[in-house]
Amino acid sequence: GTDGIRGNASHAPYLQDDFLLILGQTLVAWAHQSDAEPRFLIAHDSRSSSRRIQNALRRGIAAAGGQTIIAGMLPSPALISIVRQAATYAAGIMITASHNAAADNGIKFCSNRGKITTDDEQQLRLLLSKHTITTCKLLPLPRLKQLPKHQLTSYVTGLLELMPSRALA
C-alpha cells in the first residue's frame, strides 16, 4: 500500500512524537467536525517503532478529549473489518509501513466505510495545518483499553466462513 503517512521511523518529521501529538489532537477535531464520538481503534504491525508511534498518538488523542482502544498486532484488513462492523469508532488507525523497509513505519486511517475518502484526507490536512501543540507532552498515557474480544472473534469467524469446510483440519 501507498496510502497514509510513510517514512523512516527515526528521521521522518511526521513520525516524531511532537507531530504525532498534534495529529492525535487533529483526529479528535476531525471526529467532532463529522459529529462522531472521538473514539479510535489502533492496531499495529510488528515493527519496533509501532508502540512509540501508538503511544504518542494516544497522548494527543487523550489531550483533546478522545478515547483510544488498542487492538494490538493485527493485519490491516482485520482493523478495517472490525471498524466497519462495530460502527462505534470515529476511525481506525493502522500503524504499518506494509512492504517498506523495517526502519520505516507509517500510519493509515479507515472509517466505517473502509479507507477514508479524499474529502476526509483534505479535512484532516486543513485541520492539521491550523493546529498547534500546547502541553500534551506533559500528560501521562491514558489507561490502556483493549479491543473487546467479541469484535476480534467476529472477524476471525468471518474469515473461517470464507473457507471450505475442513480446510484447516
State where each predicted segment sits.
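Gly/Ser/Thr-enriched, mixed-charge loops and adjacent short helices
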Residues: N105-A169
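Short, charged N-terminal helix-start/capping segments
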Residues: G1-D3, G92, T96-I107, E161-S165
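Glycine-rich loops and low-complexity Gly/Arg-rich segments
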Residues: L23-T26, G65-T68, M94-T96, T117-E121, ...
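Generic structural "secondary-structure junction" signal
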Residues: T2, G7, H11, S76, ...
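An N-terminal, well-structured beta->alpha segment
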Residues: G1-R59, A63-A64, P142-A169
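Short, charged, low-complexity patches
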Residues: Q16-L20, G72, E121
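N-terminal small/polar loop signature for handling phosphorylated ligands or for N-terminal nucleophile
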Residues: A29-Q33, R39-D104
